[in-house]
Amino acid sequence: LRRVRVRHVGALEDDALAEELRQRTQVLCIVNNRRHARALFDAIAEQPGAHHLTTLMHARHRIAALTRVREELKAGRPCRLVAPSWIEAGVDGDFPTALRAEAGLDSVAQAAGRCNREGRRPTEASEVLVFSPVNWQPPQELKVFTEVFREIARTHSGDLLAMEAIHAYFQRLYRRLGDNLLDHEATLTQLRTADRGGQ
């Protein structure tokens, strides 16, 4: 992850976010829900290389869209992709810049994995800009993760992907969520029980 710089850029309204997407030739924008992704795509749809992905698309259409995205990136053509957070898992695009709506630090790290993936660009030219969407609240299930991320962004702004920042993030998250949701011993016990056939 030393291939990218991660910066928290604060609050962005959708108009400003759409302008960021217009100003960059190749950019990935990841938001926390598909309605937000659609709204942003609609704002930049006239731009060359504008793409939108959603889980509502048929798998065949998603694969075709991702193939076009990879081809455009490789050829150096304009490519502006807006998608909800599922794109973080298993999509192998290599963007020079990623914009990521606030979420957990692990999600920000996943977005960083889509930026300068092949390490061909200088780190200074490869950045992940994390923003707080003014027009969209984080989904309830992400609220605590987002709040803890903001705390870490204030205290570790120099390197949000440093081991110290990651450790601090998970420590604070553990304190906030409590033993019930992040209890490793309970998880291991459940796995051992399942391995013995539920006995």
Feature annotation, model-predicted:
Residues 2, 77, 124:
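Residue-level signal for beta-strand positions within conserved beta-sheet cores that form or flank
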Residues 3, 8-9, 31-32, 83-84, ...:
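Short His-Asn-centered micro-motif
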Residues 15-26, 30, 35, 39-66, ...:
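C-terminal helicase lobe and adjacent C-terminal extensions/tails of nucleic-acid helicase motors
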Residues 73-88, 100:
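Conserved two-lobed SF2 helicase motor
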Residues 1-22:
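Interdomain hinge/linker at the junction between the two RecA-like core domains of SF2 helicases
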Residues 90-92:
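Conserved P-loop NTPase nucleotide-binding/switch module
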Residues 10-14, 62, 80:
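A conditional alpha-helix N-cap/helix-loop micro-motif detector
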Residues 97:
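Conserved phosphoryl-transfer motifs of two-component systems
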